[in-house]
């Protein structure tokens, strides 16, 4: 990633105060939990039911968010949900759970995003051919990949009256599907799909690390190369430019790990000094630097003197 965004409250508010976040893809948004990472630092979980974009953005006024998420599950009461292991409070009643697959390929660049698109397309086609789930849409996360959002028509697990057992059965059902997908060789996140308490990035909101907007794709876009539609994705004015390829990484070089081979024969006459020369010169280039050092004879033989020199380099 070319640079790190340093958001200000004014930059974020200029986007959200002029934007309507489309929640229509969620059957009943008031049954979902909304969370966001605030510009001030802490994570905030909505303490109100969210039924519209306006109500959600009103909650941002105290501290603008860098990243906004929504739960994959819907609950009878999504406010102040108890933790799974909390036995002191009544267990929440799970009403529905979206089937979500997350595919990310790092880093954020066109080449890796194209790889993620192809992987997402392959998974979409596999799901259509091998399962009964109904795909709602595919979302560009705003950074390194995509989310497939779907519904499972098999509602048998939700007929369980005990809320704890119901949630366990739904998780087990999702885990079985996830295992099939992984066994099929698809590079999906191994946690998101089977986690009933998971939150995913909310479409229509800014990705805090890139400035690009998490966006529901037109159905045909996932079948087209990324470079044919990426410029149609909305982004904040401060968004970073998406690199074409990953940054070049120079491998770490350590002389101490080199397999230095020295002759075992004794040298008849020893010079007063040992010369150690290191150079970054590459054939055909100019103006490359070189490091030359004389090592004291009193440091010992060649191997010992080089080992001692490495301590000082």
Range-by-range predicted roles:
Residues 1-5, 9, 40-54, 91, ...:
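Helical (often loop-to-helix) elements that flank the catalytic cores of nucleotide-handling enzymes
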Residues 20-109, 113, 190, 250-269, ...:
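SsDNA-processing nucleotidyl-transfer enzymes
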Residues 83-91, 128, 132-140, 187-190:
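Catalytic micro-motifs at enzyme active sites that drive phosphoryl/nucleotidyl and oxygen chemistry
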Residues 98-101, 135-162, 199-203:
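Histidine-centered divalent-metal-coordination microenvironment in nucleic-acid enzymes
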Residues 175, 220-266:
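Long, charge-rich alpha-helical interaction segments
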Residues 192-214:
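Accessory, usually C-terminal, subdomains that scaffold auxiliary metal cofactors
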Residues 283-285, 291-309:
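Short Lys/Arg-enriched alpha/beta "domain-start" segment
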Residues 311-313:
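Conserved small/polar residues in nucleotide/adenosyl-binding loops
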């Amino acid at each position: 990633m070319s640079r790190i965004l340093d958001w200000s409250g004014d930059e974020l508010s200029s986007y959200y105060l002029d934007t309507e976040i489309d929640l229509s893809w969620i059957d009943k948004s008031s049954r979902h939990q909304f969370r966001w990472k605030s510009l001030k630092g802490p994570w905030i979980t909505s303490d109100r039911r969210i039924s519209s974009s306006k109500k959600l953005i009103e909650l941002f006024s105290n501290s603008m968010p860098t990243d906004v998420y929504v739960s994959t599950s819907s609950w009878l009461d999504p406010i102040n949900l108890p933790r799974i292991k909390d036995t002191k409070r009544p267990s929440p009643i799970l009403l529905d759970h979206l089937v979500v697959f997350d595919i990310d390929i790092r880093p954020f660049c066109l080449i890796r995003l194209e790889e993620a698109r192809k992987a997402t397309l392959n998974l979409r086609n596999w799901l259509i051919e091998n399962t009964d789930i109904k795909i709602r849409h595919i979302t560009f996360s705003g950074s390194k990949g995509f989310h497939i959002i779907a519904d499972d028509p098999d509602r048998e697990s939700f007929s369980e009256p005990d809320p704890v057992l119901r949630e366990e059965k739904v998780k087990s059902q999702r885990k079985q599907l996830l295992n099939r997908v992984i066994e099929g060789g698809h590079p999906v996140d191994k946690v998101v799909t089977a986690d009933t308490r998971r939150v995913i990035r909310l479409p229509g909101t800014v990705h805090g690390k890139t400035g690009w907007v998490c966006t529901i794709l037109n159905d045909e876009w996932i079948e087209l190369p990324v470079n044919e539609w990426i410029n149609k994705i909305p982004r904040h004015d401060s968004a970073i430019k998406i690199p074409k390829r990953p940054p070049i990484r120079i491998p770490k070089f350590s002389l101490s790990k080199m397999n230095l081979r020295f002759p075992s024969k004794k040298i008849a006459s020893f010079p007063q000094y040992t010369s150690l020369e290191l150079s970054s010169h590459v054939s055909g280039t100019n103006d490359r630097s070189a490091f030359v050092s004389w090592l004291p004879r009193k440091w010992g033989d060649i191997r010992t003197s080089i080992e001692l020199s490495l301590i000082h380099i």
